[in-house]
Structures are given as C-alpha cells and as structure tokens.
C-alpha cells in the first residue's frame, strides 16, 4: 500500500523521487484503486460516481455500454446497483465495480492495490481474464501479496519482500496455467 501510494503520488518519499514513465513519456494519466475500495466512492451512489467521472471527462462515455456488459460478466447488474451507495454494497461487488469502472477511464496506468483481496477463486479467475483484455490499451501496476495471481498475469515482478539495501529483484513473467 505504501509503494502504491508513492507511485500514485499520495505519499512522498523521505528522499529521492518516484517517476513512472512509459516509453519515455512521463506526463501520464494515472488512476489508483486503493485496497479499501470504499475510500474512492465514500457515501456516493455508483451512479453519482460514474456521473462525476463523466462530467470531469475521466470516464470514457463511448464505453458506457461495454462497461455495463463487463459488469454483467461478473454477475453485477447496473440497474440493481446504480442507486446504491458504495458503503451499502457487498465489499467484493464494490471492488469489482470500481475496478471495471476505472478500466473504462482515460488512464495510461492504473495502479491496483490488493485487487484480489476478499474475492473468491472464480472471481479471481474472471478478474485475471478481464485484466488481460484491458492490457491491450492500459498499463497496470499491481501491488499484491497474492503471488499466484501476480505471477500468472504480470510481465515483470518486483518482489519487495526480497528487497535489500542494494537492489530490487525483477523477475520476468513465469508461465502458469491460466
């Protein structure tokens, strides 16, 4: 969570700086989904949040229909949640809703902090498939203790548990069964 906060800019390092770039481009639109999804929506309804993102030209309105179809893939019906406050939704539903929503926004990079926390096996499998689809147009930084999930989806892994004062170990993607 601290690492995600440093990358997103919510936190400042005591020394040095954190830069994120893609092919030399540093002026990136970066989104962030906290490991506690209720922090993003607070007391708003899901519809109020989507409307706010549309008004601020963050949500890509041309993807509204696709967004709703993708919610359906996870068993989430927009008509059933649109007028529900985020704090009144089951935690797993809120997490999936926000993740799918942010993947339809105008971000170059989306930082996901513990995206599988609180999800069952089937939801994790669907989530992995969904994120892989989104990788065609969006870069992800995933911060997680779920090493099986990370190694099944990420092209590079920085294992901060193996961090020492001299280096961070970076592994190329390991092959696992989907």
Give the residues covered by each predicted segment:
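Conserved H-loop
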Residues: 137-144, 146-152
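ABC-family nucleotide-binding domains
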Residues: 113, 119-120
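ABC ATPase nucleotide-binding domain signature region
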Residues: 4-55
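Conserved ABC ATPase signature
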Residues: 85-89
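Helical segment within the ABC ATPase nucleotide-binding domain
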Residues: 124-136
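Hydrophobic anchor residue at the start of the ABC signature
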Residues: 98-99
